[in-house]
Amino acid sequence: MALTKDDILNAIAEMPVMELVELIEAAEEKFGVDASAAVAVAAPAAGGEAAAEEKTEFDVVLKAAGANKVSAIKAVRGATGLGLKEAKAMVESAPVAVKEGVSKDEAEELKKQLEEAGAEVEVK
């Protein structure tokens, strides 16, 4: 009686990890292949696509001022250079974009500053 693919897969599924490693090594020797080479060749193609899709500009959105509105206003003023009246109007009109088209590092830093002031912030 010949083994089916399902029989082989079920047997492999029940094997401990160390036995699987030994099985892979034996298969590599028997058939003259290297399993890691196929993985290494496929990885850069996937990584290249991910890099092409990665965003480079981010928007920092103030979703809510939080419990301490005065601290949020001060943080917005410091980040944007707006006057007190403009910063207060921005905080009170949340959700609003505080800064648009900034780098990831700058967006994360601004988010951290606003959250420390008690504001609810999102980076898009």
UniProtKB/Swiss-Prot annotation:
Q: Which Pfam families match?
A: Ribosomal_L12 (PF00542), Ribosomal_L12_N (PF16320)
A molecular function (GO) term: structural constituent of ribosome
What are the record keywords, sorted?
Ribonucleoprotein, Ribosomal protein
CC annotations in GO: cytosolic large ribosomal subunit
Q: Which domain of life is it from?
A: Bacteria
The keyword Disulfide bond is annotated on this UniProt entry:
no
Q: Which residues are the signal sequence here?
A: none
- Give the record's GO biological process terms: translation
**Assembly description:** Homodimer. Part of the ribosomal stalk of the 50S ribosomal subunit. Forms a multimeric L10(L12)X complex, where L10 forms an elongated spine to which 2 to 4 L12 dimers bind in a sequential fashion. Binds GTP-bound translation factors.
Q: Which family does it belong to?
A: Belongs to the bacterial ribosomal protein bL12 family.
| Record function comment | Forms part of the ribosomal stalk which helps the ribosome interact with GTP-bound translation factors. Is thus essential for accurate translation.
**Name assigned to this protein:** Large ribosomal subunit protein bL12
